[in-house]
C-alpha cells in the first residue's frame, strides 16, 4: 500500500488568512489526520498515540489553495531504517497537481514497514539551511496557554495548534517590521511562505504555558526567513521551532514584490547572526 | 411554560460565511445542536439525548439568507411524541421577526411522555415531500475523508451534527469542483451553490474521536438551475452508514442573489454524475 488517500475535503473561507489563501496551520490540521490514518494503516497508531519521540516536517508550498479549493492528501511511508520517514502530498482535486509536499520524520523510531510498503519520495529535497549562532536577539512574538481547541485526537497540543501559534508569531513579527494589518490592506502586500521546517521536541498538554520568540534568519530582495522558537517559559526548555521561508507577495498580481525601504530598514535591525 | 421557547440567540460571525457569501449550513447546525439540547432539557429528555443510540432525521428549509453580522434567534418546541419524538425549530431574523429557516426533527423510535401543554399545535414550517433516493449508489464519487477530530465533537463527546455537516459541506465543494463549479469559477463567474433544503439522516450508532469516515456523493436531480446532491458518510472499515444528506439547491448569481441556469459545460459534466433513480 505505498500511496494511500488519507484525507479529502476543501478549504473553507474561514481557514484563509490576510494573504488571502489557505493558511498554513490548516494544511497542518489536515496533515495531522493524514498522518494518523497512515500510521493506522502501517500498524503504528499506538506508537503515535503514545508519542515521546521528536518529529520533523519539511514542507514545500508550491501552489496556493484558496477559499473553496477542493483538495486531497496522498500519504506513504518512504523510509523505515533508523527514523521513520512519512511523505504526504496535498493534491489539487481539480487539476490533479501536487500543491504541497510534507516530508515527515519520526526521529529514532525504528519501525520497519515491509519493503513493498515503501514508496518512492518524488517531492523536493530539503537542503540544510544555515542556523543562527545566537538566539539572544529573538524578540517576543507570542505567549499563551494550551487551550482545548489546540488539542489533537490524542489529547496533546496538536500540530495545527502549534502552527496556529507560529502564525500568530509571524503576524507579530511582520508588524514589527511594518507589515501591519493596515499596511497589508492599503499597500496590498503580505507575507507568503513557500517553505516550512517544523521541529517538534515534545507536545505540551492542556493548560501548559508557552511563549514564542522570533528573529530574522535571512533578508533578500523579496524573501525573508523567520525563525520562531516555542519554549516553556518556566524552564526555558524548547517545545518546537518553525523555520518559515517566504516572500513578500503582491496580493493582486500574486507575485513576489520587493520590500519597501522603510520595511527593509526595520527588518535589518532584526537580522540574526548566522553560522 | 409556553410550548415555544427561545433556545438560542446570537449572530453570524464573518468567519462563518462561505464562498456563496452567506451563513454556511454547518453553522446553522452548530446552533441547532445547542437549541436541541436546551429544548430536550426543558422537556425532561436531556438524558435521552445524552445517551443517544437512536436515529435522527433533520428536514430543513432555508427560506431567506443570513449574512455576516445578521442577528437571529431560535424558537423551539415539541411537535409530537407519537411514533417517536418530533421537534420543531425556527430560525428568526431578530431584526424583522420573520422566520427564515425551519428544522423539522425526528428522533426515531424514542418513546417519551411530554405534557400536552408542551406540545405545539401551531407548527408553521413547510411540509417536506418524500424524495426518492437512488437505489444504486455504485456511481457515487469520493468527496471527503478524514478522522473525527476534537473540534468535531458535540457536548456529549460524539461526532456532533455540526461536525457531520461540515464534512458534507466539504463534499459539496468537491462535487461542485467535479462539475466545474471550482473556486476560480465561483470567483470569476460569480456563481455559487445555494441550498434551500436539507434532509439529514444520522444513524443510531454514532462515531467518536479518531474514528475514520469517508463521504461519497452523486447527483440525484439536475434541473435548469437546481441540483440535488446525495452525500453518504460511512465507516470505510465496515461500510456501515454513519449519515446521509440530500442537499437540494440552486446555482446562484452571487450579485443578484437569484438562481441562474447552469452553464452548458457544467451541465455536461453534471449529467455524467446523475444517479439512476
Predicted regions and their residues:
Chain A
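Hot-dog-fold acyl-thioester-processing enzymes
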Residues: 1-56, 100-195, 250-275
Amino acid at each position: 500500500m505505498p500511496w494511500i488517500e488519507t484525507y479529502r475535503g476543501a478549504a473553507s473561507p474561514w481557514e484563509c488568512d490576510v494573504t488571502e489563501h489557505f493558511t498554513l496551520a490548516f494544511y497542518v490540521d489536515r496533515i495531522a489526520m493524514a498522518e494518523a490514518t497512515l500510521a493506522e494503516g502501517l500498524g503504528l497508531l499506538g506508537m503515535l498515540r503514545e508519542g515521546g519521540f521528536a518529529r520533523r516536517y519539511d514542507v514545500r508550498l508550491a501552489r496556493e489553495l484558496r477559499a473553496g479549493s477542493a483538495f486531497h492528501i496522498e500519504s506513504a511511508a518512504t523510509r523505515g531504517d533508523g527514523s521513520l520517514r512519512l511523505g504526504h502530498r496535498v493534491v489539487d482535486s481539480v487539476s490533479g497537481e501536487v500543491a504541497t509536499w510534507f516530508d515527515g520524520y519520526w526521529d529514532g523510531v525504528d519501525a520497519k514497514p515491509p519493503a513493498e510498503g515503501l514508496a518512492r519520495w518524488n517531492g523536493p529535497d530539503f537542503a540544510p539551511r544555515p542556523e543562527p549562532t545566537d538566539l539572544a536577539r529573538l524578540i517576543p512574538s507570542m505567549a499563551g496557554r494550551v487551550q482545548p481547541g489546540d488539542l489533537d485526537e490524542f489529547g496533546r497540543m496538536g500540530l495545527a495548534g502549534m502552527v496556529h501559534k507560529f502564525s500568530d508569531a509571524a503576524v507579530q513579527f511582520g508588524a514589527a517590521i511594518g507589515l501591519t494589518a493596515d499596511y497589508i490592506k492599503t499597500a496590498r502586500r503580505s507575507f507568503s511562505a513557500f517553505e516550512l521546517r517544523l521541529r517538534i521536541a515534545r507536545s505540551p498538554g492542556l493548560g501548559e504555558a508557552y511563549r514564542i520568540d522570533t528573529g530574522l534568519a535571512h533578508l533578500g530582495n523579496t524573501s525573508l526567513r523567520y525563525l520562531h522558537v516555542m519554549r516553556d517559559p518556566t524552564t526555558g526548555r524548547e517545545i518546537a521551532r518553525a523555520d518559515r521561508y517566504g516572500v513578500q507577495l503582491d496580493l493582486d498580481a500574486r507575485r513576489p514584490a520587493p520590500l519597501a525601504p522603510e520595511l527593509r530598514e526595520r527588518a535589518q535591525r532584526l537580522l540574526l547572526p548566522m553560522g | 411554560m409556553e410550548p415555544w421557547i427561545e433556545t438560542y440567540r446570537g449572530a453570524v460571525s464573518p468567519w462563518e460565511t462561505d464562498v456563496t457569501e452567506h451563513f454556511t449550513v454547518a453553522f446553522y447546525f452548530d446552533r441547532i445542536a445547542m437549541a436541541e439540547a436546551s429544548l430536550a432539557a426543558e422537556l425532561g429528555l436531556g438524558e435521552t439525548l445524552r445517551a443517544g443510540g437512536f436515529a435522527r432525521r433533520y428536514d430543513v428549509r432555508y427560506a431567506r439568507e443570513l449574512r455576516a453580522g445578521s442577528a437571529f434567534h431560535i424558537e423551539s418546541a415539541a411537535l409530537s411524541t407519537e411514533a417517536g419524538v418530533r421537534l420543531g425549530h425556527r430560525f428568526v431574523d431578530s431584526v424583522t421577526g420573520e422566520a427564515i429557516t425551519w428544522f423539522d426533527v425526528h428522533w426515531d423510535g424514542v418513546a417519551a411522555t411530554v405534557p400536552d401543554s408542551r406540545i405545539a399545535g401551531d407548527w408553521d414550517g413547510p411540509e417536506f415531500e418524500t424524495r426518492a433516493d437512488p437505489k444504486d449508489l455504485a456511481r457515487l464519487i469520493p468527496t471527503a475523508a478524514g478522522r473525527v477530530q476534537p473540534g468535531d465533537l458535540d457536548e456529549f463527546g460524539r461526532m456532533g451534527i455540526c461536525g457531520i455537516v461540515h464534512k458534507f459541506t466539504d463534499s459539496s465543494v468537491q462535487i461542485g469542483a467535479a462539475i466545474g463549479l471550482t473556486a476560480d469559477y465561483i470567483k470569476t463567474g460569480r456563481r455559487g451553490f445555494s441550498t434551500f433544503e436539507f434532509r439529514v439522516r444520522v444513524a443510531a450508532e454514532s462515531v467518536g474521536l479518531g474514528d475514520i469516515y469517508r463521504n461519497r456523493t452523486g447527483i440525484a436531480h439536475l434541473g435548469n438551475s437546481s441540483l440535488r446532491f446525495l452525500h453518504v458518510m460511512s465507516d470505510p472499515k465496515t461500510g456501515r452508514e454513519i449519515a446521509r444528506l440530500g442537499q437540494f439547491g440552486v446555482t446562484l448569481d452571487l450579485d443578484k442573489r437569484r438562481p441562474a441556469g447552469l452553464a452548458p459545460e457544467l451541465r455536461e459534466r453534471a449529467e455524467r454524475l446523475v444517479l439512476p433513480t
